[in-house]
Design a protein with these regions (language model features):
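Ser/Thr/Asn(+Pro)-rich, low-complexity disordered segments
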Residues: 1-308
Length: 311
Protein backbone atom coordinates (compact mmCIF):
# COMPACT_ATOMS: atom_id res chain seq x y z
CA UNK A 1 0.00 0.00 0.00
CA UNK A 2 2.85 2.40 0.83
CA UNK A 3 4.47 1.94 -2.59
CA UNK A 4 1.07 2.20 -4.31
CA UNK A 5 0.33 5.52 -2.62
CA UNK A 6 3.76 6.96 -3.40
CA UNK A 7 3.54 5.85 -7.04
CA UNK A 8 -0.01 7.17 -7.37
CA UNK A 9 1.11 10.52 -5.98
CA UNK A 10 3.81 10.70 -8.66
CA UNK A 11 1.30 9.87 -11.39
CA UNK A 12 -1.16 12.49 -10.14
CA UNK A 13 1.60 15.10 -10.05
CA UNK A 14 2.49 14.27 -13.67
CA UNK A 15 -1.16 14.57 -14.71
CA UNK A 16 -1.46 17.88 -12.88
CA UNK A 17 1.44 19.27 -14.87
CA UNK A 18 -0.26 18.27 -18.12
CA UNK A 19 -3.68 19.52 -16.99
CA UNK A 20 -2.36 23.02 -16.21
CA UNK A 21 -2.34 23.72 -19.95
CA UNK A 22 -6.11 23.24 -20.23
CA UNK A 23 -7.68 23.56 -16.77
CA UNK A 24 -5.97 25.19 -13.82
CA UNK A 25 -8.85 24.15 -11.53
CA UNK A 26 -8.56 20.47 -12.46
CA UNK A 27 -4.78 20.62 -12.10
CA UNK A 28 -5.17 22.00 -8.58
CA UNK A 29 -7.50 19.12 -7.63
CA UNK A 30 -4.95 16.61 -8.91
CA UNK A 31 -2.23 18.29 -6.86
CA UNK A 32 -4.41 18.05 -3.75
CA UNK A 33 -4.98 14.33 -4.37
CA UNK A 34 -1.25 13.80 -4.85
CA UNK A 35 -0.51 15.60 -1.59
CA UNK A 36 -3.14 13.53 0.21
CA UNK A 37 -1.66 10.24 -1.06
CA UNK A 38 1.81 11.35 0.00
CA UNK A 39 0.60 12.40 3.45
CA UNK A 40 -1.16 9.07 4.06
CA UNK A 41 1.95 7.13 3.01
CA UNK A 42 4.36 9.19 5.08
CA UNK A 43 2.15 8.84 8.15
CA UNK A 44 2.54 5.05 8.15
CA UNK A 45 4.47 3.67 11.11
CA UNK A 46 6.49 0.59 10.16
CA UNK A 47 8.23 0.43 13.51
CA UNK A 48 5.20 -1.18 15.16
CA UNK A 49 5.98 -4.48 13.41
CA UNK A 50 9.77 -4.22 13.60
CA UNK A 51 11.81 -6.44 15.92
CA UNK A 52 14.87 -4.38 16.84
CA UNK A 53 16.62 -7.37 18.39
CA UNK A 54 16.45 -9.57 15.31
CA UNK A 55 16.34 -6.63 12.87
CA UNK A 56 13.37 -8.23 11.09
CA UNK A 57 9.68 -7.53 10.58
CA UNK A 58 7.09 -9.64 12.34
CA UNK A 59 4.59 -11.36 10.02
CA UNK A 60 1.75 -9.50 11.69
CA UNK A 61 -0.13 -9.10 14.94
CA UNK A 62 -3.02 -10.81 16.68
CA UNK A 63 -5.62 -8.32 17.83
CA UNK A 64 -7.41 -11.05 19.79
CA UNK A 65 -4.28 -11.81 21.81
CA UNK A 66 -3.00 -8.25 21.73
CA UNK A 67 0.53 -9.17 20.66
CA UNK A 68 2.78 -9.59 17.63
CA UNK A 69 3.04 -12.96 15.92
CA UNK A 70 6.27 -14.79 16.87
CA UNK A 71 7.31 -15.48 13.25
CA UNK A 72 9.23 -13.04 11.05
CA UNK A 73 9.84 -12.19 7.42
CA UNK A 74 13.47 -13.26 7.21
CA UNK A 75 14.07 -14.00 3.51
CA UNK A 76 15.19 -11.54 0.84
CA UNK A 77 13.27 -13.58 -1.76
CA UNK A 78 9.92 -12.48 -0.41
CA UNK A 79 7.18 -10.05 -1.30
CA UNK A 80 8.04 -8.29 1.96
CA UNK A 81 11.26 -6.90 0.48
CA UNK A 82 9.11 -4.13 -0.98
CA UNK A 83 8.11 -3.17 2.56
CA UNK A 84 11.69 -3.60 3.77
CA UNK A 85 13.11 -1.32 1.10
CA UNK A 86 10.38 1.31 1.54
CA UNK A 87 10.85 1.41 5.31
CA UNK A 88 14.61 1.88 4.89
CA UNK A 89 14.30 4.48 2.13
CA UNK A 90 11.95 6.64 4.16
CA UNK A 91 14.08 6.34 7.31
CA UNK A 92 11.62 4.30 9.34
CA UNK A 93 14.26 1.65 10.08
CA UNK A 94 18.00 1.29 9.49
CA UNK A 95 19.66 -0.30 6.45
CA UNK A 96 21.04 -3.08 8.67
CA UNK A 97 17.63 -4.73 8.25
CA UNK A 98 18.29 -5.28 4.54
CA UNK A 99 21.45 -7.23 5.27
CA UNK A 100 19.76 -9.25 8.02
CA UNK A 101 17.51 -10.86 5.40
CA UNK A 102 18.56 -14.39 4.45
CA UNK A 103 20.29 -14.92 1.11
CA UNK A 104 20.07 -18.71 1.10
CA UNK A 105 21.07 -19.74 -2.40
CA UNK A 106 20.64 -23.00 -4.30
CA UNK A 107 21.20 -24.33 -7.80
CA UNK A 108 17.79 -24.76 -9.43
CA UNK A 109 17.17 -26.05 -12.94
CA UNK A 110 16.80 -22.48 -14.21
CA UNK A 111 20.00 -21.23 -12.55
CA UNK A 112 21.11 -19.94 -9.18
CA UNK A 113 18.26 -18.64 -7.04
CA UNK A 114 17.60 -17.44 -3.54
CA UNK A 115 15.27 -19.72 -1.65
CA UNK A 116 11.80 -18.35 -0.94
CA UNK A 117 9.38 -19.74 1.60
CA UNK A 118 6.84 -21.23 -0.83
CA UNK A 119 8.52 -21.05 -4.25
CA UNK A 120 5.80 -18.78 -5.66
CA UNK A 121 6.04 -16.23 -8.44
CA UNK A 122 4.39 -13.69 -6.14
CA UNK A 123 7.31 -13.80 -3.69
CA UNK A 124 9.90 -13.17 -6.39
CA UNK A 125 8.10 -10.92 -8.85
CA UNK A 126 5.53 -8.70 -7.12
CA UNK A 127 8.14 -6.15 -5.93
CA UNK A 128 9.32 -5.71 -9.55
CA UNK A 129 6.13 -3.76 -10.23
CA UNK A 130 7.83 -0.93 -8.31
CA UNK A 131 11.55 -1.75 -8.56
CA UNK A 132 13.75 -1.00 -11.53
CA UNK A 133 16.07 -3.93 -12.11
CA UNK A 134 19.56 -4.03 -13.55
CA UNK A 135 20.66 -7.01 -15.67
CA UNK A 136 23.25 -9.15 -13.86
CA UNK A 137 22.23 -7.76 -10.47
CA UNK A 138 21.25 -10.39 -7.93
CA UNK A 139 17.63 -9.28 -7.88
CA UNK A 140 17.22 -9.50 -11.65
CA UNK A 141 19.11 -12.79 -12.04
CA UNK A 142 17.33 -14.50 -9.15
CA UNK A 143 13.90 -13.44 -10.39
CA UNK A 144 14.62 -14.47 -13.96
CA UNK A 145 16.09 -17.81 -12.89
CA UNK A 146 13.06 -18.47 -10.69
CA UNK A 147 10.84 -17.93 -13.73
CA UNK A 148 13.05 -20.17 -15.89
CA UNK A 149 12.84 -22.86 -13.22
CA UNK A 150 9.06 -22.77 -13.39
CA UNK A 151 9.12 -22.83 -17.19
CA UNK A 152 11.38 -25.89 -17.21
CA UNK A 153 9.17 -27.64 -14.67
CA UNK A 154 6.06 -27.32 -16.85
CA UNK A 155 4.98 -30.40 -18.78
CA UNK A 156 5.09 -30.28 -22.57
CA UNK A 157 2.32 -28.19 -24.11
CA UNK A 158 1.07 -27.11 -20.69
CA UNK A 159 1.18 -23.59 -19.26
CA UNK A 160 3.39 -22.46 -16.40
CA UNK A 161 3.04 -19.98 -13.57
CA UNK A 162 2.66 -21.29 -10.02
CA UNK A 163 1.89 -19.01 -7.11
CA UNK A 164 -0.52 -18.60 -4.23
CA UNK A 165 -4.03 -18.71 -5.60
CA UNK A 166 -7.49 -20.14 -5.37
CA UNK A 167 -7.92 -23.79 -6.31
CA UNK A 168 -10.69 -26.24 -7.14
CA UNK A 169 -11.90 -27.05 -3.64
CA UNK A 170 -14.80 -25.55 -1.73
CA UNK A 171 -15.93 -24.70 1.78
CA UNK A 172 -19.45 -25.20 3.13
CA UNK A 173 -20.59 -22.03 1.39
CA UNK A 174 -19.18 -23.27 -1.95
CA UNK A 175 -16.42 -20.67 -1.98
CA UNK A 176 -13.14 -21.55 -3.66
CA UNK A 177 -10.32 -22.32 -1.26
CA UNK A 178 -6.97 -20.47 -1.31
CA UNK A 179 -3.40 -21.45 -0.46
CA UNK A 180 0.20 -21.14 -1.63
CA UNK A 181 1.37 -23.32 -4.52
CA UNK A 182 5.02 -23.27 -5.46
CA UNK A 183 7.90 -24.89 -7.25
CA UNK A 184 9.66 -27.45 -4.98
CA UNK A 185 13.11 -26.40 -6.23
CA UNK A 186 12.51 -22.83 -5.07
CA UNK A 187 10.72 -23.50 -1.79
CA UNK A 188 12.30 -23.96 1.62
CA UNK A 189 9.72 -26.64 2.39
CA UNK A 190 9.41 -28.56 -0.91
CA UNK A 191 7.57 -31.50 0.62
CA UNK A 192 4.61 -29.25 1.39
CA UNK A 193 4.29 -27.69 -2.06
CA UNK A 194 1.89 -28.56 -4.84
CA UNK A 195 2.87 -27.27 -8.26
CA UNK A 196 -0.12 -28.41 -10.33
CA UNK A 197 -2.23 -25.25 -10.00
CA UNK A 198 -1.46 -22.61 -12.62
CA UNK A 199 -2.31 -18.99 -11.77
CA UNK A 200 -2.42 -16.72 -14.85
CA UNK A 201 -1.52 -13.63 -12.79
CA UNK A 202 1.81 -15.31 -11.96
CA UNK A 203 2.62 -15.44 -15.66
CA UNK A 204 1.65 -11.79 -16.10
CA UNK A 205 4.11 -10.81 -13.36
CA UNK A 206 6.84 -12.63 -15.32
CA UNK A 207 6.57 -10.02 -18.09
CA UNK A 208 9.11 -8.04 -16.04
CA UNK A 209 11.94 -10.52 -16.64
CA UNK A 210 10.90 -12.89 -19.45
CA UNK A 211 8.47 -10.89 -21.61
CA UNK A 212 8.56 -13.10 -24.72
CA UNK A 213 8.08 -16.37 -22.81
CA UNK A 214 5.35 -14.79 -20.69
CA UNK A 215 3.48 -13.47 -23.73
CA UNK A 216 3.58 -16.91 -25.39
CA UNK A 217 2.36 -18.53 -22.19
CA UNK A 218 -0.48 -16.03 -21.86
CA UNK A 219 -1.52 -16.82 -25.42
CA UNK A 220 -1.62 -20.53 -24.54
CA UNK A 221 -3.64 -19.83 -21.39
CA UNK A 222 -6.23 -17.92 -23.40
CA UNK A 223 -6.42 -20.70 -25.99
CA UNK A 224 -7.24 -23.34 -23.38
CA UNK A 225 -9.95 -21.31 -21.66
CA UNK A 226 -8.25 -19.28 -18.93
CA UNK A 227 -9.80 -15.99 -20.06
CA UNK A 228 -13.27 -14.97 -18.92
CA UNK A 229 -15.59 -11.99 -19.15
CA UNK A 230 -13.59 -9.88 -16.69
CA UNK A 231 -10.07 -10.98 -17.60
CA UNK A 232 -7.97 -14.00 -16.77
CA UNK A 233 -9.52 -16.48 -14.35
CA UNK A 234 -7.92 -17.14 -10.98
CA UNK A 235 -6.36 -20.53 -11.79
CA UNK A 236 -6.30 -23.81 -13.67
CA UNK A 237 -6.21 -26.76 -11.26
CA UNK A 238 -4.53 -29.78 -12.86
CA UNK A 239 -4.95 -31.69 -9.61
CA UNK A 240 -8.72 -31.69 -10.05
CA UNK A 241 -8.84 -32.95 -13.60
CA UNK A 242 -12.00 -32.81 -15.66
CA UNK A 243 -12.38 -34.00 -19.26
CA UNK A 244 -9.87 -31.42 -20.55
CA UNK A 245 -7.25 -32.35 -17.92
CA UNK A 246 -7.86 -29.49 -15.50
CA UNK A 247 -10.59 -27.63 -13.66
CA UNK A 248 -10.95 -23.87 -14.10
CA UNK A 249 -11.20 -21.79 -10.94
CA UNK A 250 -13.73 -19.29 -12.27
CA UNK A 251 -13.19 -16.43 -9.88
CA UNK A 252 -11.44 -13.07 -9.99
CA UNK A 253 -9.40 -11.79 -7.04
CA UNK A 254 -9.04 -8.03 -6.94
CA UNK A 255 -5.40 -7.99 -5.82
CA UNK A 256 -4.36 -10.48 -8.51
CA UNK A 257 -6.19 -8.51 -11.20
CA UNK A 258 -4.59 -5.32 -9.88
CA UNK A 259 -1.08 -6.77 -9.96
CA UNK A 260 -1.73 -8.02 -13.49
CA UNK A 261 -2.86 -4.60 -14.72
CA UNK A 262 0.20 -2.97 -13.15
CA UNK A 263 2.57 -5.51 -14.70
CA UNK A 264 0.95 -5.10 -18.12
CA UNK A 265 1.19 -1.32 -17.78
CA UNK A 266 4.91 -1.63 -17.04
CA UNK A 267 5.42 -3.98 -20.00
CA UNK A 268 3.64 -1.68 -22.45
CA UNK A 269 4.87 1.68 -21.15
CA UNK A 270 8.58 1.33 -20.51
CA UNK A 271 8.29 0.26 -16.87
CA UNK A 272 6.31 3.39 -16.03
CA UNK A 273 5.21 2.46 -12.49
CA UNK A 274 8.70 1.43 -11.45
CA UNK A 275 10.16 4.61 -12.96
CA UNK A 276 7.72 6.72 -10.98
CA UNK A 277 8.43 4.98 -7.68
CA UNK A 278 12.18 5.07 -8.27
CA UNK A 279 12.06 8.79 -9.12
CA UNK A 280 11.19 9.73 -5.53
CA UNK A 281 14.31 11.29 -3.92
CA UNK A 282 14.27 9.01 -0.86
CA UNK A 283 14.01 5.95 -3.07
CA UNK A 284 16.72 7.15 -5.46
CA UNK A 285 19.06 7.74 -2.53
CA UNK A 286 18.79 4.07 -1.54
CA UNK A 287 18.60 2.40 -4.94
CA UNK A 288 22.01 0.75 -4.54
CA UNK A 289 20.38 -1.73 -2.18
CA UNK A 290 18.48 -3.06 -5.19
CA UNK A 291 21.57 -3.36 -7.37
CA UNK A 292 23.41 -5.85 -5.18
CA UNK A 293 25.62 -8.13 -7.27
CA UNK A 294 25.11 -11.85 -7.57
CA UNK A 295 27.77 -13.40 -5.29
CA UNK A 296 30.70 -14.89 -7.19
CA UNK A 297 31.11 -17.82 -4.82
CA UNK A 298 27.87 -18.10 -2.86
CA UNK A 299 27.10 -20.50 -0.07
CA UNK A 300 24.83 -23.14 -1.57
CA UNK A 301 22.62 -25.70 0.04
CA UNK A 302 21.48 -29.14 -1.03
CA UNK A 303 17.81 -30.00 -1.05
CA UNK A 304 16.51 -33.34 0.08
CA UNK A 305 13.28 -35.15 -0.58
CA UNK A 306 11.13 -35.13 2.53
CA UNK A 307 9.87 -38.56 3.54
CA UNK A 308 6.76 -39.10 5.60
CA UNK A 309 6.74 -41.87 8.18
CA UNK A 310 3.28 -43.31 8.70
CA UNK A 311 2.69 -44.73 12.16
Amino acid sequence: LFACLITTACALAECAGQAEKTSAEFAEELKKLAARCTAIARAMDFSVLYDNTRELFHIGCSFEEGKLTPSHYDLLASECRLTSFSAIAFSRIGSEHWFALSRLMCDASGGRVLKSWSGTMFEYLMPLIFFETVPYSMQFEVCRNAVLTQILAAAAEKPWGVSESGYYAFDDALRYQYRAFGNPELALAPGRMRSDVIAPYACVLALAVEPKAAAENLRLLCQIGAAGKYGLYEALDYGAAEKNGFAIVKSYMAHHQGMSLCAINNALNNNVLARRFMSVPEVRANEQLLFENMPVDPIRIKTYELSLIHI
